[in-house]
Curated annotation (Swiss-Prot):
This is Flap endonuclease 1. The keyword Hydrolase applies. Residues 123-254 are annotated as: I-domain. Mg(2+) 2 binds at residues 180, 182, 234. Residues 354-376 are annotated as: Disordered. Residues 1-105 are annotated as: N-domain. Interacts with PCNA. Three molecules of FEN1 bind to one PCNA trimer with each molecule binding to one PCNA monomer. PCNA stimulates the nuclease activity without altering cleavage specificity. HAMAP family: Fen (MF_00614). The gene is FEN1. Phosphorylated. Phosphorylation upon DNA damage induces relocalization to the nuclear plasma. It is found in: Nucleus, Nucleolus; Nucleus, Nucleoplasm; Mitochondrion. DNA binds at residues 47, 71, 159, 232, 234.
Length: 376
């Protein structure tokens, strides 16, 4: 899920809200990672010219497992403490968008099959990413590995970005690592894109600051949310003919979608039964747990468990897996460890003015990895 054209719009109207950097600048930070985005990257990136992903001897896809293993090791070696957040059940308002994605994926698969049959490698390469999808089984495999590595995993009530944002608001994490810009719309003060422990010279990490966005644009949080709805989100349609710049200028002039609709020219077509109010409510009050008293725990590495899972069950190279485990075990002896001691003392982020005014109270999670569901 994302906000269409938001990054380009911010580059124009709030350029100071984004800064580029390298992974070592996040040493000593706790980062909430949108797990579905990360796993998708591994599934879509590690594919050959036949369209196949990395598989074991039984033909099972394994790129997401080994990719997560080495990426997590690199993050920890960089002095970062990652938390992985997995998607829960999507909101009903997203059903329409999910249906569109399914149809598009089916069309892309048909085009990919044709390109492969014709030997068009360039076209096939372009289509591979559009057909990559993370299954529940793959998600469970990644969770199992992370738990063996001692890394915290949280299954969100709803979408992962909302829970990542809630962790940042509660002061448990510094930033949300995702490619989806709606993490800002959901209230994450810091959002980092291109978050990789690899060499970032060609594609540096990009960090966005929500408070800087609001300061530079002069918008309130509610106005920023309305802007994002006008730009295009997964929860509802947009006004046809209203592009990014027009959307920004309309919010700047009229302050809210309600006022915009009262003054909007007839040349623009407003969707019938437009559910912008419901979309706004989902952004303002996402289905998340209350993390104010939540304690994040990084457990000891289960060395034998990792070997059994990766080598015995998944048939990865034992020597390489052992080297990875040794790197994890040796992190404490590195200089980065001195900075890790401050991880549990992250300051809490206070409620926004709108939340404070409305008396919002966020729900408390259970001590289990999975968030507690709302009581009916």
């Amino acid at each position: 899920m994302g906000i269409k054209g938001l990054s380009k719009l911010l580059a124009r109207y709030a350029p100071k809200s984004m800064k580029e950097g390298k992974i070592d600048q996040y040493s000593g930070r706790v980062i909430a990672i949108d797990a579905s985005i990360l796993v998708y990257q591994f599934i879509s990136a590690v594919r050959d010219t036949t369209g196949a992903t990395m598989v074991d001897e039984f033909g099972e896809t394994t790129s997401h497992i080994i990719g997560t293993f080495y990426r997590t090791i690199k993050l920890i070696e960089s002095g970062i403490k990652p938390i992985y957040v997995f998607d829960g059940k999507p909101p009903e308002m997203k059903d329409g968008e999910l249906h569109k994605r399914k149809e598009n994926a089916q069309k892309a698969q048909e085009q990919l099959d044709k390109a492969l049959e014709e030997g068009d490698k360039e076209q096939a390469k372009k289509l591979m990413k559009r057909t990559a999808r993370m299954t529940k089984e793959q998600s469970d495999e990644v969770k199992k590995l992370l738990q063996l590595m001692g890394i915290p995993c949280i299954e969100a009530n709803c979408e992962a970005e909302g829970t990542c944002a809630a962790l940042v608001k509660a002061g448990k994490c510094y930033a949300t690592a995702t490619e989806d810009m709606d993490a800002l719309t959901l209230g994450s003060e810091h959002v980092v894109r291109k978050f990789s422990a690899n060499d970032n010279k060609k594609d540096p990490i990009r960090e966005y600051s929500l408070s800087s966005i609001l300061e530079e644009t002069g918008f309130t949080m509610e106005q920023f949310i309305d802007l994002c709805i006008l730009l295009g989100c997964d929860y509802c349609e947009t006004i046809k003919g209203v592009g990014p710049i027009t959307a920004f200028e309309l919010i700047q002039q009229y302050k809210s979608i309600e006022n915009i609709l009262q003054h909007l020219s007839d040349k623009y077509k407003v969707p019938e039964n437009w559910k912008y109010k419901e979309a706004r409510e989902l952004f303002l009050h996402p289905d998340v747990a209350d993390f104010s008293d939540y304690k994040l725990e990084w457990n000891k590495i289960d060395e034998e468990g990792i070997k059994k899972y990766l080598v015995t069950e998944k048939h990865f190279n034992e020597e390489r897996v052992s080297k990875g485990i040794e790197k994890l075990k040796n992190v404490k002896s590195k200089k980065a460890q001195g900075r890790l001691d401050s991880f549990f003392n992250v300051k809490k982020v206070p409620l926004s003015k709108s939340e404070a005014a409305s008396g919002v109270k966020r729900k408390k999670p259970t001590t289990k990895a999975k968030e507690s569901r709302k009581k009916k």
